[in-house]
Amino acid sequence: MSIRLGILGLGSMGRHHVRNARATAAVDLVALADPGGDRFGVAGDLPVLGGVEELIEAGIDAAIIAAPTAHHEAAALALAEAGVHTLVEK
């Protein structure tokens, strides 16, 4: 059984989370979101979604929020309300 993971934010830290998720056997990276797109080219064959609501709609079990700090609270609250386990970057 693997964890269906989504990552919000594909900037400096998000790209590292994508790499580590892909290297972890128990993780199935299923969704990425960043309203600014994929500037580091890490998405591969995954589409880049527009935001947290689309991540939730993708049916994820867990999420990593690697977006700018100003967006943490709203994203974390939306994920919590949807029952998605979440790691929030500092």
Which residues does each predicted region cover?
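N-terminal Rossmann-like dinucleotide-binding module
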Residues: M1-G44
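Beta-loop-alpha module in the N-terminal Rossmann-like domain of NAD(P)-dependent dehydrogenases
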Residues: L46-E89
